[in-house]
Amino acid sequence: MKPIASLLAAAAVVACSDAFKPTIDNVVGDYTLQTFETTDTSGTTNWVQRGGTMTISLSPFGTTIGQLFMPGAGEGGADFETILVGDWSLSGNTITFDMPAIDTFVRDMPWTATENKLSGDHTFAGTRIKVVLTK
């Protein structure tokens, strides 16, 4: 009985020490919005609760396509919606987006790749944007 317990303990240690290491192969896929909040001097807005959506697909060839929708966030209180088209790259655990034709926070902040998740947290001109996307 003792050899089995020792084997299980060793397996648990190995499993716990095997941290996720982002690669192109394991971050490629389709991501959808889990969390999206902006915080400024007037408070925090939860865009998921307001009906906001975001999707983004990372292809193995470094291209990306997606969609961002924020109800009431456009000019004059109109809805804001845009297609996210461009390229993506991975360096360490950081994903960056190159979307020359699309001026959004998506291209302007670094994204952290963890297992089945992309997270961004950055402050622009006093407004903090926190986004989590999951596969």
What spans do the regions from the language model cover?
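Short acidic, glycine-rich loop/turn motifs
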Residues: E37-D40, L68-G74, M99-A101, H122-F124
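Short, solvent-exposed loop/hinge segments that bridge or flank secondary-structure elements
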Residues: V28-G62, F97-V106, K130-V131
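N-terminal cationic leader/targeting segments used for protein routing and processing
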Residues: P3, N26-V27, T94, K117
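N-terminal helix-cap/turn-to-beta initiation motif at the start of protein domains
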Residues: S17-T32
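N-terminal glycine/threonine-rich, aromatic-flanked beta-hairpin/loop signature
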Residues: T45-T94, F124
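Sec-dependent bacterial lipoprotein signal peptides
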Residues: M1-A15
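Beta-sheet ligand-binding and adhesion/scaffold domains
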Residues: T94-K135
